[in-house]
Regions:
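A charged helix-plus-loop insertion that forms the helical arch/lid used to bind
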Residues: 77-90
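A short acidic/small-residue loop/turn micro-motif
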Residues: 34-35, 86, 157-159
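A cytosolic small-molecule/anion-sensing beta-strand core signal
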Residues: 21-22, 67, 145-146
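Short loop/edge segments at beta-strand edges and connector loops
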Residues: 107-111
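Short glycine-rich anion-binding loops that position phosphate/pyrophosphate groups of nucleotides
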Residues: 68-71, 136-138, 243
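ATP-binding/phosphotransfer module of carbohydrate and carboxylate kinases, centering on a glycine-rich
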Residues: 1-62, 72-77, 99-105, 117-127, ...
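Short hydrophobic alpha-helix segments
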Residues: 30-32, 82, 153
Length: 294
């Protein structure tokens, strides 16, 4: 009988979930609003509901969780979460799910899961050392040695959004939310109007304000990625997050920035790629993380 796995990707805005077969095929998938403001206990209840729904329809061998926040991967619990998800810190996914359903469960940080997905079946196949960045409302990072996530001493390696840059930090200067804020302020308009997609569409038409704001973001990304490359020496750098769907526009600009800030001998040995798995990365990565442990 084919073994199936429930895979759940918990983000600040949406929970993506589905069933994945043992060979990595996604058999079914869906999503729901996280309703993060309701807090950790309500998210746990949503996860219970998802698992119970699929237990009625499939023979489930394991539960795979990808989640925002810092994760103790041994205990399978959140040891730090942003205030945007109240009462999420301390959520014991592994303990609660294994106790309730007697099915093995593994939990991993969402950016680490995205990195695993890209390394195993996406943009960084066969990479010896991989650096993965996701750029969205904030900025997250992941380091992989072959197919293994580097967690650091206490499971907080590569929290790159908090890196200090100039008089601020990386995600305060380089995230998509800052791009929208800059354009809206310079145009004396509403931030809601200027989402990433709209900004890039106008930049392609020659809008000077949008072009300048994107170039400023690329400069920040270039400096940060170059500094990370000096420390980690990755073979492949993978960029993900919604804004990175604009790869045709961004890739030459980011490559130029890396050439500016990296020594030529390092730049020529560092490959820049854009994430392939898009919205499925978290679910796939959670599945790969589970399979690595079982």
């Amino acid at each position: 009988m084919v073994k199936n796995y429930v895979s759940i990707d918990i983000g600040g805005t949406a929970i993506k979930y589905g069933v994945i077969a043992e060979d990595g095929r996604i058999l079914t998938k869906d999503k729901m609003d996280t309703e993060a403001e309701k807090g950790g206990p309500e998210i746990l209840n949503k996860v219970f509901g998802i698992v119970e729904y699929y237990l009625d329809k499939y023979k489930i061998e394991g539960i795979c969780i990808s989640t925002a926040g810092m994760v103790d991967t041994e205990k399978g619990e959140i040891f730090y979460a942003s205030p945007l998800i109240p009462r999420y810190t301390g959520t014991k996914f592994k303990e609660e799910l294994e106790r309730k359903y007697s099915i093995p469960c593994e939990v991993e940080n969402d950016v680490n899961c995205a990195g695993l997905a890209e390394r195993i079946s996406g943009a960084a196949i066969d990479s010896k050392v991989t650096l993965c960045l996701t750029v969205g409302t904030g900025i997250g990072g992941c380091i992989l040695i072959d197919e293994n996530v580097f967690h650091g001493f206490s499971n907080s390696a590569c929290e790159i959004g908090y890196m200090k840059m100039f008089d601020s930090d990386f995600q305060t200067l380089g995230a998509t939310s800052i791009l929208s804020k800059k354009v809206a302020e310079r145009k004396q308009s509403s931030k809601e109007i200027w989402d990433g997609y709209h900004i890039f569409e106008e930049a392609k038409k020659g809008d000077d304000i949008c072009i300048a704001a994107i170039d400023e973001m690329v400069e920040v990304l270039g400096i940060a990625i170059a500094n990370l490359c000096y420390v980690i020496n990755p073979q492949v750098v993978v960029l993900g997050g919604g804004i990175m769907d604009q790869d045709e526009y961004l890739k030459p600009k980011i490559e130029k920035a890396l050439q500016k800030y990296l020594l030529p001998s390092i730049a020529e040995k560092t490959r820049l790629e854009f994430a392939k798995h898009k919205n499925d990365a978290g679910m796939l990565g959670a599945f790969y993380n589970y399979k690595n442990k079982h």
